């Protein structure tokens, strides 16, 4: 949970702070280029001056003529509105986009430039530290950011038309096909716990809930007792809360009720969260969107599964969500379970069983 703001900072814009009588702005990581390379930018000694400097800093981007200037404004005004994990990925994308396209005039970008960029970025490379960079998925994400920045450029009046929207056809990413078999689930659930609570017990309950509901990890790990109503589990998908606002009620069954009770019993301490750490806190850091504690626990669980059971191929939590969709009798049921607004997403990504057809007589 983020720390509460100090009394003297309440009422100020986000990331503003009073320090030794002056007003400062804490620059989001990765956006330092738009603030003279500083992490903590001094706005002024009094509030009117601070707002004037802030206004000048924002308006300085209004005459953007290069890609770098466009990306600077995008970093200041658009990226901060996104979810933490998306924001972090966008910041990394901007760094690469600036280095490649930054000096170009806004009107100079053509579809050919985008294709050349993707062709170079799709090749994974290892730097001197051993870190792997690039790849097709990374290239696509970076182009998505550049494309959205140009969409904003049209909105802001910098240009009249998007230079490559509907003109670039990128090669699709290979869909994941891993289907977790029933016997593999049985093997995982048979894994014995070394502790009375938490750890394996929690993951067993998590797996059962995931397979019955198909909930995304971000929703499942945010479940609290407040979501448990008389008629079922009520959720609003975290991912689409600000867009479609999709709400779902998973109606109670004896099996679902048993899985929820198992999750409660597995908690190391009493907590509002259905899944919590030893401090009773939820696993998701709302400020960053990360859940490193849960990731570590899941990783250790899968290591034991591969070592102590007959399962030979690792699977992810996302694969369990796909299994739920694949095992549903109809596409519509799968779509409803996964809280998708469009069944095409469910069909293309999550329905992984081969289609059975009868031959003609």
What positions do the PLM features span?
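Short basic/aromatic active-site micro-motif
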Residues: 109, 201-203, 310-329
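Basic, Lys/Arg- and aromatic-enriched nucleic-acid-binding interface segment
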Residues: 132-136, 140-142, 155, 159-217, ...
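Short, polar N-cap/turn motifs at the start of nucleic acid-interacting alpha helices
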Residues: 226-232, 330-349
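C-terminal catalytic core of tyrosine-transesterase DNA break-rejoin enzymes
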Residues: 155, 208, 212, 218-219, ...
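Active-site/catalytic core of tyrosine-dependent DNA strand-transfer enzymes
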Residues: 253-311
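Conserved tyrosine-mediated DNA breakage-rejoining catalytic core shared by Y-recombinases
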Residues: 166-169, 178, 213, 218-265
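N-terminal DNA-binding module of tyrosine recombinases/phage integrases
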Residues: 15-116
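N-terminal core-binding DNA-recognition domain of tyrosine site-specific recombinases/integrases
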Residues: 42, 76-151, 155-158, 174-177, ...
């Amino acid at each position: 949970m983020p720390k509460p703001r100090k009394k003297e900072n309440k009422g100020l814009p986000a990331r503003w702070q009073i320090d030794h009588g002056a007003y400062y702005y804490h620059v989001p990581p990765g956006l330092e280029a738009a603030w003279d390379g500083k992490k903590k930018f001094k706005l002024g000694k009094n509030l009117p001056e601070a707002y004037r400097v802030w206004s000048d800093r924002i308006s300085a981007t209004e005459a953007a003529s290069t890609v770098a200037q466009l990306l600077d404004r995008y970093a200041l005004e658009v990226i901060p509105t996104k979810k933490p994990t998306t924001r972090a990925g966008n910041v990394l994308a901007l760094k690469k986009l600036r280095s490649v396209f930054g000096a170009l005039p806004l009107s100079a970008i053509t579809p050919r430039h985008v294709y050349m960029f993707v062709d170079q970025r799709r090749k994974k490379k290892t730097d001197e530290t051993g870190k792997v960079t690039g790849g097709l998925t990374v290239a696509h994400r970076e182009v998505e950011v550049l494309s959205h920045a140009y969409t904003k450029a049209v909105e802001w009046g910098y240009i009249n038309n998007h230079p490559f929207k509907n003109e670039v056809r990128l090669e699709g990413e290979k869909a994941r096909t891993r289907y977790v078999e029933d016997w593999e689930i049985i093997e995982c659930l048979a894994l014995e716990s070394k502790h009375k609570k938490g750890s394996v017990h929690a993951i067993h309950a998590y797996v059962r809930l995931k397979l019955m509901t198909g909930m995304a990890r971000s929703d499942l790990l945010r479940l609290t007792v407040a979501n448990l109503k008389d008629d079922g589990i009520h959720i609003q998908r975290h991912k689409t809360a600000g867009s479609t606002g999709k709400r779902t009620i998973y109606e109670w069954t004896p099996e679902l009720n048993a899985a929820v009770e198992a999750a409660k019993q597995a908690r190391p301490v009493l907590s509002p969260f259905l899944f919590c750490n030893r401090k009773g806190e939820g696993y998701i850091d709302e400020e960053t969107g990360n859940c490193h504690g849960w990731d570590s626990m899941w990783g250790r669980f899968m290591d034991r599964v591969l070592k102590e059971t007959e399962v030979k191929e690792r699977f992810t939590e996302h694969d369990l969500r796909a299994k739920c969709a694949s095992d549903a009798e109809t596409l519509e049921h799968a779509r409803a379970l996964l809280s998708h607004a469009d069944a095409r997403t469910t069909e293309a990504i999550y329905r992984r069983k081969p289609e059975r057809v009868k031959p003609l007589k």
